[in-house]
């Protein structure tokens, strides 16, 4: 079995554990409240975050040290992992503080919205911080906007477009600087910017996550006299809600990839076809022939499917929502935000998972 299939299996097990954990916590909420009623909220949240890090650690180690891609381990993994953990812990601590501050009068949606906006605003700084290596600004052909070249030791890092309202800045691996395919990839990203797919994805994902928070709140899933337990329940419910996103969103992401490919095919068809095949190799995602597996677990369609779909595509697209939600869901305390096969044990990809 190749690395891609092993990583897929690892991700499925990892997601399954967080899903079962979250369902169990919500199912035994009353018993948990009785057991921990005398413990302070700060201690509960601190123990919960620390526990989530410990549970996830074996998966991170296997993903980084055993199931690495292209025959080369990430030699900066430990430093990047610590910085990634610091970043996520800071985000979750901020969300918890805002809930302490605002929830009694304003509910859970406002603290979540503020946290999501801050996560979006700091995406660029977080990427540079977690990567822990050199970067520089550059001008690239076919992309009108700010470009950052990042010297990244994670070989499956592809960068992408930064979140933002009307934003047109991108980040690329420094290893692509001399690539003959950089021009066509920049053209693809320009198509994404021109069609406002980043903005569409941003609005859709904010709506999706706030809808999940609101449903949980109206159903009383978070209610507890101990605000710490309320935050734990919020985290568990949003982990379940994010699982629905993992199952439903890849199909919508496919339509965006097909449409961008369709428009880019008019620019340089031969180069695009070569790049599609090369890109699949770079991100180390096998062309799984099982259609159900493709539609659920792979937001980026197989190289063969992309090439076969170049002549026609739907223009009704939400953007690359599936994997972008992995990063955005930091703002809703999603325990599985770094448990998918594409980013397990790859700290920089916790912020920028591969997308096309």
What is the role of each PLM region?
Residues 1-223, 248-334, 350-356:
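Polar-ligand-bearing catalytic/cofactor-coordination segments
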């Amino acid at each position: 079995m190749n690395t891609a299939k092993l990583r897929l299996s690892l991700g499925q097990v990892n997601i399954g554990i967080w899903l079962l954990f979250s369902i169990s916590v919500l199912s035994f909420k009353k018993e948990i409240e009785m057991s921990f009623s005398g413990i302070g909220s700060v201690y509960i949240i601190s123990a919960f975050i620390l526990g989530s890090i410990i549970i996830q650690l074996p998966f991170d180690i296997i993903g980084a040290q055993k199931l690495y891609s292209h025959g080369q381990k990430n030699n900066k993994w430990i430093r990047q992992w610590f910085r990634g953990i610091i970043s996520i812990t800071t985000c979750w601590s901020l969300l918890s503080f805002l809930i302490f501050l605002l929830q009694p009068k304003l509910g859970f949606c406002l603290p979540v919205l503020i946290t999501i906006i801050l996560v979006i605003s700091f995406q660029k700084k977080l990427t540079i911080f977690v990567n822990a290596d050199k970067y520089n600004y550059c001008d690239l052909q076919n992309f009108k906007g700010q470009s950052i070249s990042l010297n990244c030791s994670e070989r499956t890092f592809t960068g992408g477009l930064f979140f933002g309202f009307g934003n047109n800045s991108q980040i690329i691996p420094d290893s692509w600087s001399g690539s003959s395919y950089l021009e066509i990839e920049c053209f693809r990203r320009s198509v994404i910017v021109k069609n406002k797919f980043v903005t569409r994805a941003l609005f859709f994902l904010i709506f999706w996550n706030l809808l999940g928070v609101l449903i949980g709140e109206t159903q009383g899933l978070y209610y507890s006299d101990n605000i710490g337990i309320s935050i734990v329940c919020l985290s568990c419910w949003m982990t379940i809600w994010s699982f629905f996103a993992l199952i439903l969103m890849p199909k919508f992401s496919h339509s965006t990839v097909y449409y961008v490919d369709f428009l880019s095919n008019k620019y340089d068809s031969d180069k695009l076809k070569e790049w599609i095949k090369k890109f699949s190799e770079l991100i180390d995602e096998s062309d799984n022939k099982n259609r159900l597996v493709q539609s659920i677990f792979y937001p980026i369609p197989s190289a063969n499917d992309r090439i076969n779909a170049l002549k026609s595509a739907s223009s009704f697209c939400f953007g690359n929502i599936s994997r972008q939600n992995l990063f955005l869901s930091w703002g809703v305390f999603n325990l599985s935000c770094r448990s998918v096969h594409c980013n397990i044990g790859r700290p920089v990809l916790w912020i920028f998972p591969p997308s096309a």
